Design a protein with these regions (language model features):
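Extracellular receptor-binding modules and their adjoining Ser/Thr/Gly/Asp/Asn-rich linkers
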Residues: 1-141
Length: 141
């Protein structure tokens, strides 16, 4: 069953609410676990990546569960800002960094399986600091 008021959307991701064990910034990489359903992802290049907290989902599933602080929307698929540290080039794959909840570009000499990849970068990032950048993501289970 689809409940909709139009066939288009202003934003670009499909997201679902999940119970979080703590408040999470928008663009945070998450994994299943913690004291609730999801927690900030840990472990550089982990294959337990589940998704990314959404900023403005186009389609919101499980919308009556909690609020943005207790049950953030997790982008299941689509275009979403992701917290990334270090430089990244458009088209780079991103994986979890050694910083909790933050991704990084996969280095040229590294390989990753599909469960380690958070998404693909849509814009160049030229500084080393942590910032959010647009990426295409897909939920992993």
């Amino acid at each position: 069953v689809v409940h909709a008021t139009s066939t288009g959307a202003m934003y670009s991701d499909v997201a679902e609410r999940y119970a979080a064990d703590d408040y999470m910034q928008k663009g945070t990489v998450v994994m299943i676990g913690g004291t609730e359903e999801i927690t900030e992802a840990t472990g550089e290049m982990t294959d337990r990546v589940f998704g990314v907290t959404s900023t403005q989902p186009a389609f919101m599933m499980n919308s009556s569960a909690g609020n943005n602080d207790s049950h953030p929307y997790i982008a299941m698929v689509g275009r979403v800002p992701v917290r990334v540290i270090g430089t990244a080039n458009k088209g780079d794959r991103i994986v979890l960094s050694d910083t909790k909840g933050v991704a990084r570009a996969l280095a040229a000499n590294e390989t990753a399986n599909c469960n380690q990849v958070v998404g693909v970068v849509l814009q160049n990032k030229t500084d080393a600091a942590e910032n959010t950048i647009e990426c295409v993501v897909q939920c992993r289970v």
